[in-house]
Amino acid sequence: MQVYGEEGRRKVERHRQLRKGKGFATIERTTRVDLAEPEAGATVLLECMTNLAANEMFSGEGQEDAAGGREQGPGATETVIGSRILEDVERLYAKCRNLVIVTGEVASDGISYDESTESYIRLLQRVNCSLCQQAEEAYEVVYTIPVCLKKKPEEPAVGKESL
């Protein structure tokens, strides 16, 4: 999360305390999650895709210039940025044992926004759908209640006879 002001710092610290002792590797990056170097066999928590998508779309921070082949900032299309985010997440996943991604749903209020915000919403929807398709498991938390959207099929027990 790009931290702005005291409220942002308090929010980040609160989240750090909530994760403490849960077995997640903490790597703090506002963009380019593929550059993170978790310890071998780590379970990585990527929190939060809504912030990462906004940072990748609007800040341009940490991006290579045109010679490096990474289009950046508001001039880049949501399709280009979405593909880049998904590639970065794939490279991060290749470096760890488990990857847990927290995201948010930001378009259910029925409000019309300016074009750059609508573009961000489309970007996040595209990324979230793709991540859910690739995930072994996916949950939506509704008023603190986890609702399973997708669950990894249980493997049959060895030695059990079929019915």
Regions inferred by a protein language model and the residue ranges of each:
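A basic- and aromatic-enriched beta-loop-alpha substructure that forms the phosphate/nucleotide-
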Residues: 22, 31, 42-67
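Conserved P-loop
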Residues: 1-39
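Short amphipathic alpha-helices and their capping/turn segments at secondary-structure boundaries
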Residues: 26-42, 84-96
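Conserved protein kinase catalytic core
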Residues: 34, 53-54, 110-111
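Active-site flanking residues adjacent to catalytic metal/cofactor-binding acidic residues
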Residues: 27, 46-47, 103
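Short, surface-exposed amphipathic charged segments that create phosphate/polyanion-binding patches used
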Residues: 39-46, 153-155
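Conserved nucleotide-binding/hydrolysis micro-motifs of P-loop NTPases
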Residues: 2-5, 50-52, 106-108, 145-147
